Amino acid sequence: MNHIFKVFLVIAVTSFTSSLLAQDTTSDGGAKAYIISPADGATVSSPVTVQFGLSGFGVAPAGVERAKTGHHHLLIDVEELPDLNSPIPGDEHHRHFGGGQTEVTLDLAPGTHRLQLLLGNHQHVPHNPPVLSELVTITVE
């Protein structure tokens, strides 16, 4: 009986480890995320519509594991990037678009805001290398 438990434990640990390793979705470095609108340096009024762009990859909803795809995460006023080896957090500074959305309308307070896109795989983990847009800085009046 003890031997059966050990075999089961080895199988369980191996399966768990394999699922963790599967989260590391590679990109070929040719994919590019970008913010279509608003433009860097733009002065806008709230609400602000942010349009997402992606080339060299496709958009797929969270939970759908498909090569060369992912879904957008909008980083709003973050001081540093999240851990690129873990799922992207979900909070007011890290907005998830797991349904495959390619734009959002945000209510932003007056002032300067920094926007950046980070593509996540089916489990919200960034690709390797990360598919990350340039930082866009806007001013909301």
Task: Describe the residue ranges of each PLM region.
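Short, solvent-exposed, Trp/other aromatic-anchored flexible loops in extracytoplasmic proteins
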Residues: 88-112, 118-120
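Short amphipathic, basic-aromatic surface patches that mediate peripheral association
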Residues: 53-64
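N-terminal signal peptide c-region/cleavage motif recognized by signal peptidases
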Residues: 17-18
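Short acidic/polar inter-strand loop motif in beta-rich domains
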Residues: 81-83, 120-128
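A glycine-anchored, Pro-Gly-centered beta-turn/N-cap motif
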Residues: 46, 70, 109-111
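Short coil-to-beta strand junction motifs in C2/discoidin
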Residues: 64-72, 132
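Short, compositionally biased P/S/T/A/G/V-rich stretches that sit at domain boundaries
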Residues: 24-45
